[in-house]
Swiss-Prot record:
Catalytic reaction annotation: L-histidinol phosphate + H2O = L-histidinol + phosphate
GO biological process terms, semicolon-separated: L-histidine biosynthetic process
Taxonomic superkingdom: Bacteria
Pathway assignment: Amino-acid biosynthesis; L-histidine biosynthesis; L-histidine from 5-phospho-alpha-D-ribose 1-diphosphate: step 8/9
UniProt-recorded name of the protein: Probable histidinol-phosphatase
NCBIfam families assigned to the protein according to its UniProt record, in alphabetical order: hisJ_fam, PRK07328.1
Pfam families according to UniProt: PHP (PF02811), PHP_C (PF13263)
An example molecular function term from Gene Ontology annotations: histidinol-phosphatase activity
EC number(s) recorded for this UniProt protein: 3.1.3.15
Xref: InterPro entries: Histidinol_P_phosphatase_HisJ, PHP_dom, Pol/histidinol_Pase-like
Keyword annotations: Amino-acid biosynthesis, Histidine biosynthesis, Hydrolase
Length: 260
C-alpha cells in the first residue's frame, strides 16, 4: 500500500482509544503506508460530550506528542496533525477558536449528535427503536449540510454514520442532497473503513453513495478511524478499489490545503 496515507486516527487523549501515537506511527510503517494524519476528537465546550474527547487544556499536550512523533519518524513516515471536529449548532464560535490555535493539516467535520442523543454510542442504541428512520436521516443530513456550509472543515466525516448499528437509510434523497452541498462547497469525504468493523459491516459511505459522490467530483480521504494501533490502514486496499471502480479519486491535506 505504498503511497497511501491514513488520515483518520485517534489517541488516548480522547478517553476511548488505546496505544501511544508512536505505536500508531509504527503500525503505519508496518502496514506499508507512507503517511498518517492524527485527527483526535477536538475539545468542545465542557457541557458537550466531555468523556469522549480531550479537554481544551490538553490541546498543547496533543500537539507536543504528535510533533515528537514527527521528529522521530522524519524521513520514514509523513506524519501530519489534524482534528476531528464536531458540528453541533451553537458551538461554531468555540470550534472556530480552537481551529485558530494551531496550523492544522486537516480538519474533519463530523456529526455525532442529534440534539442530546449520541446516536453512534452503543450505550444509547435502543433509542433507534423510538425513532422514525426517515425523519432521523432527514435531520441528520440537515446537520451534515450545515457542517459543509459552515466553512470550518475540510471534509465530512463518516457520511452515513447513523447506519452503524444496522439502521439503514430508507430513502437516499437527503443523502444525495447533502452530497450536492458538499460538492458545491468544495469539500472532501472521509472514506472511513471503520464501518467494516461495525455491526453494519459496510464502510462509510455506502457503495451507492461512493458512486454518487464520485459522479459529483467529490474526492475521498482514506481513514481507518483507528482507536488502537492494529486498526491503522484497515482494509485500505479494498477502499482504494471501491473508489477507483466508480471513477473516484483520493486526496490528502496539508496545512488545510487539498493535495492529490
Amino acid at each position: 500500500m505504498t503511497g497511501l496515507c491514513d488520515s483518520h486516527l485517534h489517541t488516548p487523549l480522547c478517553g476511548h482509544a488505546t496505544g501511544t501515537p508512536r505505536e500508531y506511527a509504527q503500525a503505519a510503517l508496518d502496514a506499508g503506508l507512507s503517511g498518517l494524519c492524527f485527527t483526535d476528537h477536538m475539545p468542545m465546550p465542557r457541557w458537550y460530550d466531555a468523556p469522549w474527547r480531550m479537554k481544551l487544556e490538553q490541546l498543547p499536550e496533543y500537539i507536543a506528542e504528535i510533533q515528537a512523533v514527527q521528529q522521530e519518524f522524519a524521513g520514514r513516515l509523513d506524519v501530519r496533525l489534524g482534528l476531528e471536529a464536531d458540528f453541533h449548532p451553537g458551538t461554531e464560535k468555540f470550534v472556530e477558536k480552537v481551529l485558530g490555535m494551531f496550523d492544522w493539516d486537516y480538519v474533519i467535520g463530523s456529526v455525532h449528535y442529534l440534539g442530546a442523543w449520541g446516536f453512534d454510542n452503543p450505550e444509547f442504541v435502543a433509542e433507534y427503536e423510538e425513532r422514525d428512520l426517515g425523519g432521523l436521516y432527514r435531520d441528520y443530513y440537515a446537520l451534515v449540510e450545515g457542517a459543509a456550509r459552515s466553512g470550518l472543515f475540510d471534509a465530512i466525516g463518516h457520511l452515513d454514520l447513523p447506519k452503524k448499528f444496522g439502521h439503514l437509510d430508507p430513502d437516499p434523497v437527503y443523502a444525495l442532497h447533502a452530497l450536492d452541498v458538499v460538492a458545491g462547497q468544495g469539500l472532501a469525504l472521509d472514506f472511513n473503513t471503520a464501518g467494516w468493523r461495525k455491526p453494519v459491516a459496510e464502510a462509510y459511505p455506502a457503495p451507492d453513495l461512493v458512486r454518487a459522490a464520485a459522479e459529483r467530483g467529490i474526492p475521498f480521504v482514506l481513514g481507518s478511524d483507528a482507536h488502537q494501533p492494529g486498526e491503522v490502514g484497515f482494509r485500505f486496499a479494498d477502499a482504494v478499489k471501491e473508489i477507483r471502480d466508480v471513477g473516484g479519486r483520493t486526496v490528502t491535506f496539508r496545512h488545510r490545503k487539498m493535495q492529490p
